[in-house]
A protein has these predicted regions:
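Conserved class I S-adenosyl-L-methionine
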Residues: 1-42, 44-53, 56, 60, 80, 144-166, ...
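Class I SAM-dependent methyltransferase SAM/SAH-binding core
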Residues: 54-103
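A conserved beta-strand element that flanks and buttresses the S-adenosyl-L-methionine
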Residues: 115
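A short glycine-rich, Lys/Arg-flanked "PGG" loop and its adjoining helix->strand segment in the class I
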Residues: 127-139
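A C-terminal cap/extension of S-adenosyl-L-methionine-dependent methyltransferases
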Residues: 158-162, 184, 195-244
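Acceptor-substrate binding/catalytic loop of class I
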Residues: 164-181
Length: 244
């Protein structure tokens, strides 16, 4: 486990500069961020963002009037996120630090909300991470998350294609999550799902063969993110859970 975390930390240390330059402008991230912020509407008090990356969501959380704590496994991402907040929301109530989702350095029942995007898929197992999320949430608090959707068309077709070709993914590629399994894991930990959506409507191999057409289709389908059919097509699963 320690070796896997060190590898993930090293990967995102190396990606930090790229995240600063590109991540905030990518449509896949922008559409994902819009959905999670909609799910956080109405939250008051204190929020923890786990896996904050280069900090692209932090100004939005501050604009919502929230007191923000943010952590990332990567020290380089922490440095970029801290600078992003200083530049865009100087004086905002935001603390950024290195941290591990499986050992959160916060007391029990501290937060009104927890946000994590692109985190759970890098863990070999998710039980300890979910337990920590539940622990630091206040009763009635909510968790909003985004993960690759293992039930979506893109990941199903891509996985089947690679199996037929005998190809192997790189060790650090985030593993897509099955929505119903994730929902069940959170329910078992004392969290009730209150809403969900899907985004990033990309299709394999179109995304690689015709990226411009793929982007147009993605943008065309994005308004369907909350329809019941969205999890069948969206490559990203977004969900909100409330602590019972």
């Amino acid at each position: 486990m320690a070796g896997a975390k060190a590898a993930v930390r090293s990967l995102f240390d190396d990606l930090a500069s790229e995240y600063v330059a590109q991540r905030g402008r990518e449509f896949s991230f922008v559409s994902q961020k819009r959905l999670v912020l909609e799910m956080l509407a109405g939250v008051r008090g204190r929020i923890l963002e786990i896996g904050c990356g280069a900090g692209h969501t932090l100004p939005d959380l501050l604009d919502m009037g929230l007191e923000v704590d943010a952590i990332d496994l990567s020290e380089q991402m922490v440095a970029r996120a801290s600078e992003h907040v200083r530049r865009h929301r100087p004086g905002g109530r935001c603390r950024v630090a290195a941290g591990d989702i499986e050992r959160l350095d916060f007391a029990t029942a501290q937060f009104d909300a927890v946000l994590l995007m692109g985190v759970l898929e890098y863990l070999p197992g998710q039980a300890q991470a979910i337990a920590e999320i539940v622990r630091v949430l206040k009763p009635g608090g909510c968790a909003v998350l985004a993960v690759p959707n293992g039930a979506g068309a893109y990941h199903i077709v891509r996985t089947l294609y690679r199996k037929l070709r005998g190809a192997r993914d790189q060790a650090l590629v985030g593993k897509p999550c099955l929505p119903w399994r994730l929902d069940g894991d959170f329910a078992a930990a004392g969290m009730r799902k209150t809403e969900s959506a899907a985004c990033n409507f990309i299709f394999f191999p179109l995304k690689d063969l015709a990226p411009r057409l793929s982007d147009r289709i993605n943008r065309l389908l994005t308004p369907t993110a909350r329809l019941p059919t969205a999890p069948l097509l969206g490559a990203q699963y977004i969900a909100k859970f409330r602590k019972i």
